[in-house]
């Protein structure tokens, strides 16, 4: 459904998704997903099928669930994008999630993760530093 009246609700649903993971509220996490929701992690070649499998992944995360700082949520209709900083027990990762809805619920997500890295010197003459310094719990 591409009803523009759903856009504010969908933006809120995305926020609730990340807040539920961060807060360990797995009942709330399940509530924002379709029962057959699919999450893809292309960098590791993994696919999570079903809301319950998604819940189980986050329930069993070594070191606990990540903390998120949401930089931006943008989109409209059925397709949205969230840009985040995620702090895991093994470090900070920059994340982009492509989120697809079926009605008011999240039906598909594809998440891309990248660590920070030092900027190469050869580009220094043409670029300026741009630090995304959000802390977990902050949004930009």
Language model: regions and residue ranges:
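C-terminal and inter-domain tail/linker signature
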Residues: 1-140
């Amino acid at each position: 459904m591409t009803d523009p009246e759903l856009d504010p609700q969908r933006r809120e649903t995305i926020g609730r998704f990340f807040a539920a993971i961060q807060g360990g509220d797995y009942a709330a996490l399940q509530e924002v997903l379709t029962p057959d929701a699919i999450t893809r992690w292309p960098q590791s070649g993994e696919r999570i099928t079903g809301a319950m499998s998604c819940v189980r992944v986050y329930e069993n995360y070594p070191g606990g669930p990540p903390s998120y700082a949401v930089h931006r949520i943008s989109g409209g209709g059925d397709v949205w994008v969230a840009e985040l900083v995620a702090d895991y027990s093994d470090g900070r990762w920059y994340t982009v999630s492509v989120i697809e809805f079926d009605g008011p619920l999240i039906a598909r997500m594809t998440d891309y993760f990248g660590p920070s890295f030092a900027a190469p010197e050869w580009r220094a003459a043409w670029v300026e530093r741009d630090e995304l310094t959000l802390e977990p719990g902050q949004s930009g």
